[in-house]
């Protein structure tokens, strides 16, 4: 007896075609092309999630560096001074302070300056 798989196959195709609904041209209509486009899109999404972390860290460091240089310290001196002083604050919070609360950021800069003896 032959095993028929029409229901599952149709469900699989429908799932892919539903996922690629807004794609351009044949990529949203033809199953074979749609499947390739879907796989590629998922791959790009995965890579993008990894790159996002990198990009945000770069942005935070740039913001901290600009704010620290306005106070007379380089980025690496600021981070080194904060580590010597035992201050546990991450780059995300430090950049938020630099942008939104410059007075608090200035206090952290002073702590770092005292720790490195500047």
UniProtKB/Swiss-Prot annotation:
The keyword Membrane does not apply. GO terms for biological process: ribosomal large subunit assembly; translation. Keywords: Ribonucleoprotein, Ribosomal protein, RNA-binding, rRNA-binding. GO terms for molecular function: rRNA binding; structural constituent of ribosome. It holds the Pfam family Ribosomal_L20. One of its GO terms (cellular component) is ribonucleoprotein complex. It comes from the Bacteria. SUPFAM superfamilies: Ribosomal protein L20. Belongs to the bacterial ribosomal protein bL20 family. Binds directly to 23S ribosomal RNA and is necessary for the in vitro assembly process of the 50S ribosomal subunit. It is not involved in the protein synthesizing functions of that subunit. PANTHER family: 39S RIBOSOMAL PROTEIN L20 (PTHR10986). This is Large ribosomal subunit protein bL20.
